[in-house]
UniProtKB/Swiss-Prot annotation:
It comes from Bradyrhizobium diazoefficiens (strain JCM 10833 / BCRC 13528 / IAM 13628 / NBRC 14792 / USDA 110). This is Succinyl-diaminopimelate desuccinylase. Homodimer. Binds 2 Zn(2+) or Co(2+) ions per subunit. It is an enzyme of class 3 (hydrolase). GO terms for molecular function: cobalt ion binding; succinyl-diaminopimelate desuccinylase activity; zinc ion binding. The keyword Signal does not apply.
Length: 388
C-alpha cells in the first residue's frame, strides 16, 4: 500500500532509534524504486560516531527541481510500559496513529511520499506532463542526535555529483496547535561557548593568599547577559543569551577554587553573523574584566547559522495549498529550535511544513489519521502548483 497511513505504519514498526536504521530507509526505497526513482543508499562515517545510512532518490533530470527532506531516526521510547499501545506498534486507536515517530517525523515523510506517488500517477509517471521537472527525497537517519553523518554530508555528496536543488520542503512538525497554522521559513542561529575565569586556589581561612573566581564569574555573567543583544528584526524575535551551568569542580568546602567556568548558548537573529556575535560578547567581557579579572571564552564550533527564506512565489504557493486544504492561512514563522533546514538553506530556499508537534518525543506520541490525509493533500497541492 502506498497511502500515507500504510507507509507511516510501516515506518513506525521499524524501531529506528537514532542512529539505528532498523529497516526504515528500506521501506521508502522500495516504494520509490517501484515508482521509477533512482535511489542511492549512502553511508557516512566519522571517528567517534556511529556509521549512518542515508537515502537520496530522484526522478527526472531537468528543472525545476523540488526536494522533500526528512529523517527516519527517532528518539528513544522511554518507559514503554507507560505507553497505552506498543511504542513501535503503529497501531491506530480512536482515529489516531500511535507510535514513536508518528509526528516527528515518520508521519510527515509518509505524507510526502504518498503525495509524490499520487502526483506521478496523475502525470504519466513524470513530475510534469511534458516530461520536464524533477522530484527528489533527501532522507537521513542522523537528525535526533549529533547530526554529523546525515543531511549535511548527504547534501555535500549530492552537490559533488552535480545535483542542484531549486526548492525544498522539510516535513518537520511545524504546526503549533492545528494543521495549517504555521510554516517555518527560517531559524535563528545557535552558538555555544564556555566562560573561564582564573583564580588562585587557597584555604578559605587565608583568603588574602588566594583569589576567588566565584564572585568574579558572577559579575561577568551579569555583565555579558544583562543587556539585550538586540530587539529583534523584521522576521525574527530578539536574540537571547542564556547561561546554562556554572561550575568550579570543587568538592571541598574549605578550599577556594582556582578556576570557575560557565556554559552558555546564544540563539541569534539576522542582526548578527557568527563572527559579529562573538565580537559583541568578547567586547562586553573585556569591558567587564578591566585590568583585574582574567577571563576568556572558548567558543564551540557551530554550523547552525541564522537563515530565512523570504516571502515570494515559493512561500506563496505553499500558503495557497495549505489554505485550500485546511481553511487556515499559516503564519510564516522563524521561531523554535534548530533543524536540518539550517544545512539545506545553503543549497536552496527551504520551508518547513509538517504535522502538529504537540506530542512529539512524548509517551503516546500520536497523530490524527485525518491530519495524515490532509497533509498528503497539502503536499499534492504544492506539487500541482509547483509544476503547473
Amino acid at each position: 500500500m502506498t497511502d500515507a497511513l500504510s507507509i507511516a505504519r510501516d515506518l513506525i514498526r521499524c524501531p529506528s532509534v537514532t542512529p539505528a536504521d532498523a529497516g526504515a530507509l528500506g521501506v521508502l526505497e522500495n516504494a520509490l524504486n517501484a515508482a521509477g526513482f533512482t535511489c542511492h543508499r549512502v553511508t557516512f562515517s566519522e571517528p567517534g560516531t556511529a556509521d549512518v545510512d542515508n537515502l537520496y532518490a530522484r526522478i527526472g533530470s531537468e528543472g525545476p527541481h523540488i526536494t522533500f527532506a526528512g529523517h527516519t531516526d527517532v528518539v528513544p521510547a522511554g518507559d514503554e510500559s507507560a505507553w497505552s499501545v506498543g511504542a513501535f506498534s503503529g497501531e491506530v486507536k480512536d482515529g489516531f496513529l500511535h507510535g514513536r515517530g508518528a509526528v516527528d517525523m515518520k508521519g510527515g515523510i509518509a505524507c510526502s511520499v504518498a503525495a509524490v506517488l499520487e502526483h506521478l500517477a496523475a502525470n504519466g509517471g513524470k513530475p510534469r506532463g511534458d516530461g520536464t521537472g524533477s522530484i527528489s527525497f533527501l532522507i537521513t537517519g542522523d537528525e535526533e542526535d549529533v547530526s554529523i553523518n546525515g543531511t549535511i554530508k548527504l547534501l555535500k555528496w549530492a552537490a559533488e555529483r552535480g545535483e542542484t536543488f531549486d526548492h525544498c520542503v522539510l516535513g518537520e512538525p511545524s504546526n503549533v496547535e492545528t494543521l495549517g497554522d504555521t510554516i517555518k521559513v527560517g531559524r535563528r542561529g545557535s552558538q555555544s561557548g564556555t566562560l573561564y575565569v582564573d583564580g588562585v586556589q587557597g584555604h578559605v581561612a587565608y583568603p588574602h593568599r588566594a583569589s576567588n573566581p566565584v564572585p568574579d564569574i558572577s559579575r561577568l555573567i551579569v555583565a555579558i547577559s544583562d543587556e539585550p543583544l538586540d530587539h529583534g528584526s523584521a522576521q525574527f524575535q530578539a536574540s537571547n543569551l542564556e547561561f546554562t551551568s556554572v561550575d568550579v569542580g570543587n568538592k571541598a568546602n574549605n578550599v577556594i577554587p582556582g578556576e570557575a567556568r560557565a556554559k552558555f548558548n546564544i540563539r541569534y537573529n539576522d542582526n548578527h553573523t557568527q563572527a559579529s556575535l562573538r565580537e559583541l560578547v568578547e567586547t562586553r567581557l573585556a569591558k567587564a574584566c578591566g585590568n583585574r579579572i582574567k577571563a576568556r571564552i572558548v567558543w564551540e564550533p557551530s554550523n547552525s547559522n541564522v537563515f530565512v527564506t523570504k516571502p515570494g512565489p515559493f512561500t506563496d504557493l505553499a500558503v495557497s495549498a495549505i489554505e485550500e486544504i485546511t481553511g487556515r492561512k499559516p503564519e510564516l514563522s522563524t521561531s523554535g529550535g534548530t533543524s536540518d533546514a539550517r544545512f539545506i538553506s545553503s543549497y536552496c530556499p527551504v520551508i518547513e511544513f509538517g504535522l502538529v508537534g504537540q506530542t512529539m518525543h512524548q509517551v503516546d506520541e500520536r497523530v490524527p489519521v485525518k491530519d495524515l490525509e490532509k497533509l498528503t493533500q497539502v503536499y499534492r497541492g504544492i506539487l500541482t502548483r509547483y509544476f503547473g
